């Protein structure tokens, strides 16, 4: 859906520019800028999700270590 919208918008921009305006380098730079912005949005979201996943895994490991230590203390108290 995003790609279709992007394609239609960029097509409109290209079709609206007249060849006599010598405007193509501006269009090309705009397309490159939009592409980079989309790339940042896509990879930025992935990086944030990876960071959240890593934090979740660390929290799980900490919780398991705490439970293991608590179990060992209780076991030592009964011995």
Swiss-Prot record:
Residues 48-67 are annotated as: Disordered. GO terms for biological process: defense response to bacterium. It comes from the Eukaryota. Residues 1-22 form the signal peptide. Pfam families: Antimicrobial12. The modification Glycine amide is found at residue 44. Keywords: Amidation, Antibiotic, Antimicrobial, Secreted, Signal. It is found in: Secreted. Residues 47-79 form a propeptide. GO terms for cellular component: extracellular region. Belongs to the pleurocidin family. This is Dicentracin.
């Amino acid at each position: 859906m995003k790609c279709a919208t992007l394609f239609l918008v960029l097509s409109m921009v290209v079709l609206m520019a007249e060849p006599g305006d010598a405007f193509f380098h501006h269009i090309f730079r705009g397309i490159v800028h939009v592409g980079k912005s989309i790339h940042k949005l896509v990879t930025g979201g992935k990086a944030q999700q990876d960071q959240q996943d890593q934090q979740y895994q660390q929290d799980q490991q900490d919780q398991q270590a705490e439970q293991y230590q608590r179990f060992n203390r209780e076991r030592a108290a009964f011995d």
